[in-house]
Amino acid sequence: MEGNFEEQNKLPELKLDAKQAQGFLSFYKTLPNDTRAVRFFDRKDYYTAHGENSVFIAKTYYHTTTALRQLGSGSNALSSVSISRNMFETIARDLLLERNDHTVELYEGSGSNWRLVKTGSPGNIGSFEDVLFANNEMQDTPVVVSIFPSFHDGRCVIGMAYVDLTRRVLGLAEFLDDSRFTNLESSLIALGAKECIFPAESGKSNECKSLYDSLERCAVMITERKKHEFKGRDLDSDLKRLVKGNIEPVRDLVSGFDLATPALGALLSFSELLSNEDNYGNFTIRRYDIGGFMRLDSAAMRALNVMESKTDANKNFSLFGLMNRTCTAGMGKRLLHMWLKQPLVDLNEIKTRLDIVQCFVEEAGLRQDLRQHLKRISDVERLLRSLERRRGGLQHIIKLYQSTIRLPFIKTAMQQYTGEFASLISERYLKKLEALSDQDHLGKFIDLVECSVDLDQLENGEYMISSSYDTKLASLKDQKELLEQQIHELHKKTAIELDLQVDKALKLDKAAQFGHVFRITKKEEPKIRKKLTTQFIVLETRKDGVKFTNTKLKKLGDQYQSVVDDYRSCQKELVDRVVETVTSFSEVFEDLAGLLSEMDVLLSFADLAASCPTPYCRPEITSSDAGDIVLEGSRHPCVEAQDWVNFIPNDCRLMRGKSWFQIVTGPNMGGKSTFIRQVGVIVLMAQVGSFVPCDKASISIRDCIFARVGAGDCQLRGVSTFMQEMLETASILKGASDKSLIIIDELGRGTSTYDGFGLAWAICEHLVQVKRAPTLFATHFHELTALAQANSEVSGNTVGVANFHVSAHIDTESRKLTMLYKVEPGACDQSFGIHVAEFANFPESVVALAREKAAELEDFSPSSMIINNEESGKRKSREDDPDEVSRGAERAHKFLKEFAAIPLDKMELKDSLQRVREMKDELEKDAADCHWLRQFL
């Protein structure tokens, strides 16, 4: 594989003479210094990059600096790297689609005369679409967001505008946010933002540090713009040109915002929408409702493996890869990408999607027919955009035509369905398809193509305007054919004069240099040499023969070339005219693309549900104010899809007042993390409108999923594992509501055992007593299981805390620990670690000491401060004074209660830490005369 890569991406030789090199060096020095810009120079057959860009490319993509060459000499030498066209596509895709830290510039020219012809950034890839998607589908829609924050009295109001250049949509929003910017983060995730426009001056304020962190968590490129660009001047006239339809509703919409309008002004300036007249009258504008979808932050997206990652071993590792099982066209894949970031909260719309999926699951014949027809549908959205940008031609129009003529087959398949959901299928798809394909819409487009394009030539791979479409073109075609006939007659006449066989001895060629010429082999040349020198003009003598002409052939050839040039020019004019006419159908094709892409995604959901070895079920969906989350026989869809896994299903019953808050304990690698994540994934799938991997499921709609799972070190940002845990947990404490779903895994590992336990206990109490959200809390702190007993004693509690554990079996004969991966009620046996050490043949002295120390710690465990001796089991006798133990335990319990009362969701992190330090200092003072309590400090 490496050999093939090297073969395809060989380093082209950098060929510049001294004069060209000097001219280029002079130009290169005039370029402004921009550390984010990666500049490429088109040298016709290959590209080059220079200076720091060349070093970056050599190290990042060639993985060696031996690829570098020096342009010039001495102190003026400039490091350079040459790049093949294949490699340029690879690099451009990585810079614009995968990374978020560079812009791309492409220059054309020679010597010292170069001009910038293309610029691109992660949020604005339009100029490079022909390169990025020449051999790959466009799976995501890049969105540029502009934000204008206002800080006042410790609060922040965000004005936000965004543009989706693929779907031609502008959006506005304005909302209050907390210090962790949870609303902004979930909005960026939902929109799929790749780049964020931000006022340069605002970035210098202390308040913006957390805002910048939020943007970085979402992998969004930050582009600072001068503050004077964030003004709403001339917005009315700009929007009047851009937005389709009546301007009055647009004015009413925009007038309702204070901060979003400056953000929109900067966005229009940055995206240069007004510089392209093709955009005029083609955009829609809408209010973006941050509560319109389930909120997902970057931590939840990462924890639930929603989107694909470069590290995935196969596509089934991510939810997108799994559910993108049979999406055929790029527009369907892009819609799925968007849906997974925007799960629904509208009960009726969720049920409608589920009805359609159920229809497709139950009607295998309908599903297969529709899938076969959709396979022949092209990416309508991309074809349309290429035509609108005048980068497409007849080939794009033909693909639209071939897609359009498949619609009657799709309609027929739907008309034949008479099942339970026939009326829904008719309303949702059939009637809309009939309206779109009538004679006033796509019927007219089909007529246009059939009368303007020579469809017979498609078999030869030629895309041409039909000569019958235009009288001038028809006349030129007749002239061309007449001249072709005259040239062939001259060919025959000349063969008779020279006594040579037509096409065997005397051939008629068309050369790029000479036009129409006669050719004979060198063997035949001596036979006609005398006539050749007196009656003809010899043009070229080579091994393949002698090329010659005469005045008649040259005259006819020149006339023929002139007519061909006129014919091509007329063809081009007519193609441009047809393309312009086709773009008038943009709105119809946009509606068609939306219809077909939705059908494509829901068919993919049905294919997944029907093809899985263990069936999926349709979830019962209830409102967020009622019902529980009950999953019977639930499975993790991505884990069970791996070839090497025999998945053990588990039940999960998050029930109000009984088990709304679940503490899950058990040995490492026992399945705790998989279990709690699969619940989050299943809820997300259900609210997207998919069947779920369960035997039976009932789900109360959630407005948000929060996940704190497996934080890693972020040293490059100066953030430790523990700090990352705390930051993510702070987002949960501030942003969660009783309608959210919370998933927390192994909180408190990055600090001391007692600090970690104290934090875990306090966070649990806060979530139970204040947030009251359904929560799955996997932990290695077995003492937390006492929370269930403590919570049951609180009067008026409606949450319900329950203990669950993942089970394991120790075989005393084989000395093997077997994970059973079953989640069962109750707390976990805490002795697995020492058993495993014993069976691993640890020295007996080490095992004995471990048991002794474990017993000591059990005496001093935090649970002894919470529940009585009878409930916590028998304790080893100890020498501490009972009064001292009682006094110390009471003080420790007071500390934990005070800690739990801290309003973490309303305090800045530094203030919270300061308050904890003060409490700890007070505790240490009180412990000075208590030996038992000092053992914990």
Curated annotation (Swiss-Prot):
Stored InterPro entries: DNA_mismatch_repair_Msh2 (IPR011184), DNA_mismatch_repair_MutS-lik_N (IPR007695), DNA_mismatch_repair_MutS_C (IPR000432), DNA_mismatch_repair_MutS_clamp (IPR007861), DNA_mismatch_repair_MutS_core (IPR007696), DNA_mismatch_repair_MutS_N (IPR016151), DNA_mismatch_repair_MutS_sf (IPR036187), DNA_mmatch_repair_MutS_con_dom (IPR007860)
GO cellular component, one term: plasma membrane
Induction conditions: By UV-B.
Residues covered by region (Disordered): 861-888
UniProt keyword terms in alphabetical order: ATP-binding, DNA damage, DNA repair, DNA-binding, Nucleotide-binding, Nucleus
Alphabetized Pfam families for the sequence: MutS_I, MutS_II, MutS_III, MutS_IV, MutS_V
Cell inner membrane keyword on record: no
Compartments where located: Nucleus
Residue spans of biased composition, Polar residues class: 861-870
Positions annotated to bind ATP: G666, P667, N668, M669, G670, G671, K672, S673
Record note on what altering S737T does: In strain: cv. Landsberg erecta
Effect of T404A: In strain: cv. Landsberg erecta
Phenotype reported upon loss of the gene: No visible phenotype under normal growth conditions.
Effect of S468N: In strain: cv. Landsberg erecta
Predominant subcellular localization, coarse grouping: nucleus
CDD domains membership: ABC_MSH2_euk
Gene Ontology BP term (one): mismatch repair
Keyword DNA-binding: yes
Ranges annotated as biased composition (Basic and acidic residues): 871-888
Annotated effect of mutating I902M: In strain: cv. Landsberg erecta
GO molecular function: ATP binding; ATP-dependent DNA damage sensor activity; damaged DNA binding; mismatched DNA binding
Subunit structure: Heterodimer consisting of MSH2-MSH6 (MutS alpha), MSH2-MSH3 (MutS beta) and MSH2-MSH7 (MutS gamma).
Family per similarity comment: Belongs to the DNA mismatch repair MutS family.
Function: Component of the post-replicative DNA mismatch repair system (MMR). Forms three different heterodimers: MutS alpha (MSH2-MSH6 heterodimer), MutS beta (MSH2-MSH3 heterodimer) and MutS gamma (MSH2-MSH7 heterodimer) which binds to DNA mismatches thereby initiating DNA repair. MutS alpha and MutS beta recognize single base mismatches and trinucleotide insertion-deletion loops (IDL) in the DNA. MutS gamma recognizes specifically the T/G single base mismatch. Plays a role in DNA homologous recombination repair and has a broad range of anti-recombination effects.
Database matches in PANTHER family: DNA MISMATCH REPAIR PROTEIN MSH2, DNA MISMATCH REPAIR PROTEIN MUTS FAMILY MEMBER
UniProt protein name: DNA mismatch repair protein MSH2
Species in which this protein is naturally found: Arabidopsis thaliana
Gene, per the UniProt record: MSH2
